[in-house]
Amino acid sequence: EPVLDPSIMPAANHFGGDLEGVLQTLEDGYFDALGMNTVWVSPVTQNAEGAWGLWQDSARTAVQSRFSSYHGYWPVSCTEVDRRYGGQPAMHALTDGAHAHGMNVLLDYVGNHVHEDHPLMEAHPDWTTELYLPDGSLNTERWDEHRLTTWFDTFMPTLNLERPEVAEAMSDSAAWWALHSGIDGFRHDATKHISEVFWRKLTAKLKAAQQRTGKRLFQIGETYGSPDLIGSYLSSGMLDAQFDFNLYDKAVGAIAFENGNWEDLVATNEASLSAYGAHHIMGNITGNQDRPRFTSLADGSLDVNEDMKFQGWTMDIQHSGDQGYAKMRLLMSYLMSVPGIPCVYYGDEIADVGGNDPDNRRMMRFDNLNPEERTTKEWTSAWARLRTSRMSLLFGNTAFAIL
């Protein structure tokens, strides 16, 4: 159900995917055949209508587009499932169906901010951080210098979760999902931008919910930063794990590019083992919704010295030769072999292509795969099954050798 607004380019609009489609894919046996045991779904809460924001290329000449809420990160409700995805019944059907097939469902949860159309903004306008800094400048995208207060955009108020009453209300909303949706855990958006006050309240409530449901929910966070910052959220009072983006970046550098720096990858892997433990459960990704597709980096379709979001808007990025497939298979082998939880971004199992967001969110292709795509999918499945069946890959010692 796309937003009918000509200022939104097609790639930044809704494409029609819904929870029923995820359930159908699960029931068709796709994830089981791939060797996966958990599905992480995008944020499903009711999102804003209409066109918002504006992206322009740096020269402000070739491309500009506003956006729909296709990504799910503009919530206007804390508990209602977006009607475009099928509403609450579709969410329950998905979790019930997943459990019937022995699979788990992780919900992408947005706790840091809301959309300005969220009812909270009328009821409690004082629950946000300040949009303007004391010097009069906008406090937007100040990811590190004002990480607990910065707004993502002017229409996305950041909640002041250091205030106990705000943290109490928002952690209640998150805990509601644990009690009423059937999910098995959370992927928490923008973890480092949220106060520990919230994380400790939420984790305490999830532990209380466990006493009622008998289910322990898994929590994995999203934090870009140093191992010390990432690790500061890992404790019995907060999260179970975070994604290891530092490791992914070094894996891209070593595997995707000619003359890759394997020494850097080894050093970063050893740093992760030192910081998080020899048998940690950090998330090791093949890609995600904030990065250009690995395959398009690996086969040279993308110019790393140019804006890869702009390239996604303006180029018809397709496969360039076979090396991207081979390098994706190498990345899969690596991530399935090191400590941590392998996390396959949809489409990477067939070495899908694309620039940065939104070009990295193309419609999933299940049919009419070429031979290299089929081989990559079979490779992914074989490694996933090895990972879950071989004790050496689950609990063995880790050592690195550069030949």
Residue ranges and their predicted role:
Residues 78, 120-121, 127, 159, ...:
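Short clusters of hydrophobic/aromatic residues that line enzyme substrate/ligand-binding pockets
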Residues 189, 278-321, 359:
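Active-site clefts of carbohydrate-active enzymes
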Residues 1, 7-15, 19-37, 46, ...:
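Carbohydrate-interacting/catalytic domains
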Residues 86, 328-330:
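Outer-membrane beta-barrel transmembrane strands
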Residues 113, 172-175, 179-285, 334-337, ...:
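Active-site-proximal helices and loops of the catalytic beta/alpha 8
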Residues 4, 8-11, 79-80, 307-320, ...:
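Short, basic, glycine/proline-bearing loop/turn elements
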Residues 1-181, 201-212, 228-230:
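Substrate-binding/active-site clefts of carbohydrate-active enzymes
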Residues 1, 39-41, 105-107, 186, ...:
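Hydrophobic faces of well-ordered beta-strands that scaffold small-molecule active sites
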